[in-house]
Amino acid sequence: MTCSNPAQTVARSVDGQRAAELLQSVRDHDLPPCLRSLVAEYQTFEGARPLFIWQWVHRLAPKNAMPVVGDDHRETVATNKTILVLFVTILDDLVEKRQDYATFDAISRLVRLRADDADPMPTETFRSDVDGEYVAFARTVWTTLLDRLEDAPRYDRYASLFRFDVRQILTAIEYTTVVIDSPELATRADLDRYETHNMGMYSYLDIDLMYADGDHAGSLSLLRDAVDAGQRMARIGNWLSTWERELREGDVSSGIVVTALERGLVGPEELPDPDGSADVSVAADRLIDRIVEHDLESELLDEWNGEYRRLCTLSERSDAVDLGPFVEGTKDVLRYHLASRGFK
């Protein structure tokens, strides 16, 4: 395992032909029937994200998996993780695209419940400003995921931790709304503290452990440290591939834009209005050009390298679990992020 600075090497490897091959491998990827059905229903809602996203997530899910999952559970785990991402995306769409906080709060109650609590809001009790159809679909996605997870061999051991970690994703989404509404309050430190959890990799780990062949409770602390590094690396890859699109949409919560704000490269008053009521493409393109001139993307790749080295150190300390495949998988995830720029 080479623990130097692979990010730049990965970035250089994603040339036009290689990027096209990676993208085609995603487009050719088949979703399992359960997931295909949920995605088809999701796409009936206005503003739904394209099929490519779900093919991308499902194809890459094994790269984010800890090597504790038995071969007979790998497909189930990949599907469960993709269903989780679909649920998170439903919530993301509500606050980032629709600014529908009432519906967001209604759906969030599903996650904030204890496992044995009753449904927090029957359909007939929705307030008038809550999108009941959207909540009903979100409930279907969430209960489908829980029903599948309950069949996992070690579900009971990790169920409460899973719910806790999913709640951190909700906090990450809520922090994003703070940044969008008040970009002058955004800091990279807060992004790393809160928003990075939007990647959901702690919850991914919980799912892996539910389907583990053995009991890895004794390695849980080290595994969560490893996931922390991997999640930051995944967040950087996501920022690199989406920040320009998000800026044009008025979402200024990416690490690149927040860094530009902190350094005074752009001012809060220059940012596009998140309500999408005006054509801001020209103004956004000017900001993008200015940010690109300062090469902030290279700085993020350097940060990625730092997390990679931390992950390598953790791998060397791990005796009970071979973290090598997870470490190597982070490079593939970065490669696919960079190849999919402009497609997600």
List PLM regions with ranges.
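Conserved N-terminal diphosphate/IPP-binding helix and adjacent helical/loop segment
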Residues: 1-86, 90, 94-98
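N-terminal, motif-rich segments that launch catalysis or mediate targeting to/interaction with membranes
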Residues: 6, 12-45, 104-180
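All-alpha helical catalytic cores of prenyl diphosphate-utilizing isoprenoid enzymes
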Residues: 47-61, 128-240, 244-247, 324-344
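Aromatic-acidic/polar surface patches that form glycan- and anion
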Residues: 76, 80, 195, 226, ...
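Short hairpin/turn module used for nucleic-acid contact or packing/dimerization
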Residues: 80, 104-107, 301-344
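Well-ordered alpha-helical segments within folded domains of soluble proteins
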Residues: 80-83, 197-206, 306-310
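Acidic, Mg2+-coordinating active-site segments of isoprenoid diphosphate-utilizing enzymes
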Residues: 92-114, 205-299
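Primarily interfacial, aromatic-capped hydrophobic alpha-helices that serve as membrane anchors
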Residues: 121-156, 262-321
